[in-house]
A protein has these predicted regions:
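Conserved ABC transporter NBD signature motif
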Residues: 63-71, 83
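Conserved ABC ATPase "signature" region
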Residues: 71, 116, 122-140
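A short, proline-enriched helix->beta-strand linker immediately N-terminal to the Walker B motif
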Residues: 164-168
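Helix-to-loop junction immediately C-terminal to a conserved catalytic motif
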Residues: 55
Length: 232
């Protein structure tokens, strides 16, 4: 298997009134295509920040990021737009990560519109229905709004939105921590099925050891911004 993501000496520091906060401090790792790297640690250890820096949702202080062998450490705007097609994120809170003014179909269809993937409204509608079916959302919900659905279905919307552009790589930031235990297993199994079907590569961020054991091929432990252990 080929290496899809390589991170070298990545740092992310924040200025605070007490000096520099080393949220991510000299972290290095690589992920092979089709595998899941579980990143586990207590709250505040820097694991979510790491995922956001890898996706350029936050700028790195220092370090190198390679995606499919290409250095993407400081991408220009056009390159970053291109990277968004292949690098996506599923957020922790399905309650706040979705636009409350958009319907399910509009949320999932928005990336397709931004990237001009579909040539007609009919093609767009068909693609949205296909994605909804893939993530286990019945067609009857396409005109529903996020507040009308439970947490599990909201997270399925977030997963569908992330899948819309057929990415290669997804950062999953505590995607089941806000859900009931009974729903957590359903979402985890869905994500594993999607990974097998589409050969997706995940960084799976969590504080729950049982979750990371269930879904991960490799596990990285973080503490105070530092990688303290990595196992396969």
């Amino acid at each position: 298997m080929s290496t899809i993501l390589e991170v070298r000496n990545l740092k992310k520091y924040f200025n605070t009134k007490n000096g520099l906060l080393h949220a991510v401090d000299n972290v290095s790792f690589s992920i092979e295509e089709g595998r899941t790297l579980g990143v586990v640690g207590e709250s505040g250890c820097g694991k979510s920040t790491l995922g956001r820096v890898v996706l350029h949702l936050l700028p790195a202080t220092e370090g190198q990021i390679l995606f499919c062998g290409e250095d993407i450490s400081n991408p220009k705007k056009a390159k970053l737009h291109e990277l968004r097609r292949n690098m996506q994120m599923v957020f922790q809170d399905p309650y706040s990560s979705l636009n409350p003014r958009q319907s399910v179909a509009e949320i999932i269809g928005e990336p397709l519109k931004v990237y001009h993937v579909c040539r007609s409204k009919q093609e767009l509608d068909e693609r949205v229905r296909e994605i909804m079916d893939t993530v286990g959302l019945p067609e009857r919900y396409q005109h529903s709004y996020p507040h009308e659905l439970d947490g599990g279905r909201r997270q399925r919307i977030g997963i569908g939105r992330a899948l819309a552009l057929n990415p290669k790589f997804i950062v999953c930031d505590e995607p089941v921590s806000a859900l009931d235990v009974s729903i957590q297993a359903q979402i985890l199994n869905l994500m594993m099925d999607l990974q097998e079907k589409y050969r997706l590569t995940y960084i799976f961020v969590t504080h729950d050891l049982s979750v990371v054991k269930h879904i991960s091929d490799d596990i990285m432990v973080m503490y105070l911004g530092v990688m303290v252990e990595k196992t396969s």
